[in-house]
């Protein structure tokens, strides 16, 4: 049976009336099942690795980690005295720090040694005591700094390090990374110069403690261990006799705080948003049933959407936050159109079922076109290289379908069931006939002016937005400025000379088909070039005061240099030397000498890294892997310390390192890849840009193809799509004017604009077409469209805008931005659908008539 004829509508209405109760029961059961799947509420994954696209570097890193320890992950701890203005380097504070460090080590030892290293002032002092104190005492055994220094200092002076680049580099790194900018070590120098007389206590307002966690752990394990460390240190810091306070930050902890606090905040915002929607629907329809039915239906649709994805085993990313407002926006639109048509049909029949079927019959083509086109537009996100964006597109498409089913079937069944049992409900929805007259008259007089204004605004938007919008991906953007983790991060940025310490890993492996790296002499030359380049790169940490620049990184090159400088006979045994800060070969060098030097270091348990307290063997194992027979180099890893506070700096660093790896591959005949958290962030940024451009273009293209296929008319299809594209450009221009950049949520605004824009445009076009087919002239058809569809769109768009505006109450910057930009997007989509599209449709009619 086809809808449209009175007989078929009456038969379907009879079936629908009988099925109303089963439909409501089935919807309720489906909602309960979906709701149970959402209990407890799912977490929104914010782990960096979940956003990153798969690259060749991932495969290379997997090969390397088969024979080498995985790169570590860092926890940053900002340590300040509990007493304001106190000295964090007082011996008592250092003793507590040593005790707390030991507690962390005990926790690590009880959990498979998940801590691989510490950068910690107390640890450095303990290493010095282990190496130089004849009695092998610990910090706790001393009462003053003078006693401690007496045990490790002989006849040294502060000036003794001059000329010792390694010592200066270590000290400079420690000062810039670990100690507050106000660090004062003059008392130590004066004490040394005065024959160990006086108080040598150095001073600083704060110190940094970096804990490096094993890279072998999964993200969940790493988070669990990070939380254990945070809980342990916070408990110890709140003890009555504690002299220190700890502020702890890491990407894992930031993700956890987002899941625990920000998403809870968002749930309340969404509930408030729904409350606002209820008030606006009540104002529009002035009927409890007209408010309750769509609200229940859309709540069910949201539960079906999220519940279905959970049952499929899909992990939600933070992007899925945006699904709810999109589904609500589209669902409200479907419901308002259907309910207004239902009101009109109800005046002509006593059967609520027949009235609902007739309302759907009138709107079925517009609704079907809208749902199919919008769903395909969202599915275009499958083109994205970022896995979460693929899932986001699928979730949105499912949400559109759920909203359609709930709005047409469930809401209709509720109306039929309620009116069947409780009697006829009074419907007095808002009417806008006078506004329709004014809008039509405006179009008749000013169509050309409107189109010219739109063209000018679009051109201005493009000009303003070109080069103005940056892409950002900072996990901390999802947290409010008043949250502890943000306060700690800001304090760290202000306190230390090296801000936002991060690392970039360079992985070097043999060419495909080769089992080892060959040409050790040439390899050393290439590594020397890299060492020189790193020394002059803007964002690479380079300690000051050395005779030759020594960038802060670890790898085979600085490893060999440090080993040779620490023991000249080591270099002689392997025909290697350090010449003016550069590692080179000496007489007698042959292929394999570098590998033999590495083999020796892999068995050396002496301290090889004073800052972290690692042995030569531990340090070497992290950076070099030999072939199974131990005679050649197989894999190399270089871990470079860099600073990057924002996405712009991240992109610049990634570009510099990419150029460097290209030169390295050409020079050494090897394969080189980049990895590390900073590169991960850059890959996400690049993926977001690509996704935004490709998905927008593809969404519009797919939408056009679907419309042409369904309508078999290219003219109207182009007319429908044009305002949607214009709305997208206007939104981008508005973002540029407001200073809002692309981030992981606002990047989705084009999907929202396309989804709602197509829906609005199809409703306007379809109603205009129906009115024309019924014999109305161009302007009468437009007036009728404004009176019916236009009024419905004003209600639905106004409701959606107010719902999004509630997000401005969020303390979270990116959610506020998303709420504002979404509201602007809906407003632009509405303006273009009601002011521009009617003029284009009228122009098309005149063109079709040969005028």
Please state what every model-predicted region is.
Residues 1-2, 347-357, 407-437, 778, ...:
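Feature of multi-pass inner-membrane transport and sensor proteins
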Residues 2-274, 278-289, 421-697, 846-851:
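Feature of extramembrane
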Residues 22-30, 268-273, 277, 298, ...:
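Hydrophobic alpha-helical transmembrane segments in multi-pass membrane proteins
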Residues 257, 261-268, 295, 334, ...:
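Pore- and gate-forming transmembrane helices of large, multi-pass membrane proteins
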Residues 259-316, 367, 383-387, 694-740, ...:
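Interfacial segments of transmembrane alpha-helices in multi-pass membrane proteins
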Residues 278-282, 298-299, 315-336, 379, ...:
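Hydrophobic transmembrane alpha-helices
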Residues 280, 312, 368-418, 704-708, ...:
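Hydrophobic, glycine/alanine-rich multi-pass transmembrane helices and their short helix-loop junctions
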Residues 326-347, 367-369, 373-374, 404-411, ...:
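Short helical (or helix-break) motifs at transmembrane helix termini and adjacent helical loops
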């Amino acid at each position: 049976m086809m809808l449209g004829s009175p007989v078929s509508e009456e038969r379907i209405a009879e079936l629908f009336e009988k099925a109303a109760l089963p439909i409501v029961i089935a919807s309720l059961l489906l909602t309960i099942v979906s709701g149970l799947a959402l209990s407890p509420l799912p977490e929104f994954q914010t782990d960096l690795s979940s956003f990153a696209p798969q690259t060749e570097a991932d495969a290379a890193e997997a090969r390397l980690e088969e024979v080498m320890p995985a790169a570590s992950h860092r926890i940053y701890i900002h340590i300040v005295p509990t007493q304001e203005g106190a000295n964090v380097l007082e011996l008592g504070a250092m003793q507590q720090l040593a005790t707390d460090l030991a507690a962390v080590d005990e926790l690590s030892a009880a959990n498979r040694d998940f801590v691989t290293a510490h950068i910690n002032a107390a640890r450095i002092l303990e290493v010095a005591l282990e190496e130089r104190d004849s009695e092998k005492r610990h910090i706790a055994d001393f009462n003053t700094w003078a006693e401690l220094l007496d045990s490790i200092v002989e006849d040294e002076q502060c000036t003794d390090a001059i000329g010792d680049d390694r010592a200066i580099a270590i000290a400079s790194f420690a000062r810039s990374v670990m100690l507050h900018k106000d660090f004062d070590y003059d008392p130590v120098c004066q004490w040394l110069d005065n024959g160990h007389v006086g108080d040598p206590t150095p001073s600083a307002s704060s110190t940094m403690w970096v804990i490096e966690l094993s890279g072998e752990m999964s993200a969940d394990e790493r988070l669990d261990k990070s939380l254990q460390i945070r809980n342990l240190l916070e408990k110890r810091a709140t003890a009555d006799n504690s002299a220190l306070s700890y502020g702890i930050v890491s990407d894992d902890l930031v993700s956890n705080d987002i899941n625990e606090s920000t998403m809870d905040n968002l749930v309340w915002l969404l509930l408030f948003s729904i409350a606002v929607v209820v008030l606006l629907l009540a104002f529009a329809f002035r009927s409890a049933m007209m408010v309750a039915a769509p609200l229940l239906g859309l709540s069910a649709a949201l539960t079906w959407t999220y519940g279905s994805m959970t049952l499929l085993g899909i992990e939600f990313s933070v992007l899925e936050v945006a699904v709810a407002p999109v589904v609500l926006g589209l669902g409200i639109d479907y419901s308002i159109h259907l309910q207004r048509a239902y009101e009109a049909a109800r005046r002509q029949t006593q059967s609520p079922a027949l009235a609902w079927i007739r309302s759907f019959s009138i709107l079925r083509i517009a609704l079907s076109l809208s749902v199919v086109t919008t769903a395909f537009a969202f599915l275009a996100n499958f083109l994205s290289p970022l896995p979460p964006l693929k899932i986001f597109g699928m979730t949105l498409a499912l949400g559109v379908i759920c909203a359609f089913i709930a709005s047409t079937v469930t809401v209709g069944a509720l109306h039929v069931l309620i009116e069947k049992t409780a009697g006829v409900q009074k419907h007095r929805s808002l009417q806008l006939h006078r506004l329709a007259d004014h809008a039509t008259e405006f179009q008749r007089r000013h169509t050309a002016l409107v189109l010219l204004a739109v063209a000018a605004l679009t051109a201005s938007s493009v000009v303003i937005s070109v080069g103005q919008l940056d892409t950002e991906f900072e996990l901390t953007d999802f947290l409010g400025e008043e949250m502890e983790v943000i306060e700690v991060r800001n304090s760290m940025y202000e306190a230390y000379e090296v801000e936002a310490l991060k690392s970039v890993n360079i992985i070097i492996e043999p060419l495909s088909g080769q089992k080892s790296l060959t040409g050790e002499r040439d390899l050393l030359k290439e590594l020397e070039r890299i060492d020189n380049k790193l020394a002059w790169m803007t964002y690479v940490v380079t300690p000051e005061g050395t005779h030759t620049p020594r960038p802060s990184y670890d790898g085979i090159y600085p490893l060999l240099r440090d080993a040779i400088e620490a023991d000249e006979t080591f270099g002689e045994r392997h025909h290697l030397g350090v010449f003016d800060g550069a590692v080179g070969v000496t007489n007698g060098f042959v292929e394999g000498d570098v590998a033999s030097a590495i083999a020796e270091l892999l068995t050396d348990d002496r301290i090889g890294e004073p800052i972290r307290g690692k042995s030569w063997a531990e340090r070497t194992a992290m950076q070099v892997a030999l072939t199974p027979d131990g005679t050649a180099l197989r894999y190399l890893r270089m871990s470079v310390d860099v600073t990057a506070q924002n996405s712009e700096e991240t992109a610049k660093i990634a570009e510099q390192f990419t150029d460097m790896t290209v030169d390295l591959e050409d020079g050494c005949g090897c394969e080189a890849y980049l990895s590390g958290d900073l590169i991960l962030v850059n890959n996400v940024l690049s993926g977001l840009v690509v996704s935004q451009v490709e998905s927008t273009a593809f969404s519009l293209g797919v939408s056009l193809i679907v419309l042409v296929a369904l309508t078999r008319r290219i003219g109207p299809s182009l007319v429908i799509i044009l305002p949607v594209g214009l709305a997208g450009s206007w939104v981008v221009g508005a973002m540029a004017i407001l200073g809002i950049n692309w981030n992981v949520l606002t990047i989705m605004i084009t999907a929202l604009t396309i989804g709602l824009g197509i829906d609005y445009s199809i409703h306007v076009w379809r109603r205009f077409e129906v009115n024309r087919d019924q014999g109305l002239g161009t302007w009468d058809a437009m007036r009728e469209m404004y009176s019916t569809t236009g009024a419905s769109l004003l209600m639905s768009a106004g409701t959606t805008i107010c719902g999004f505006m509630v997000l401005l109450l969020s303390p979270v910057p990116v959610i506020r931005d998303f709420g504002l930009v979404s509201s602007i997007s809906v407003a632009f989509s509405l303006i273009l659908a009601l002011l521009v599209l009617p003029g284009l449709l009228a122009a098309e009619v005149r063109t079709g008539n040969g005028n």
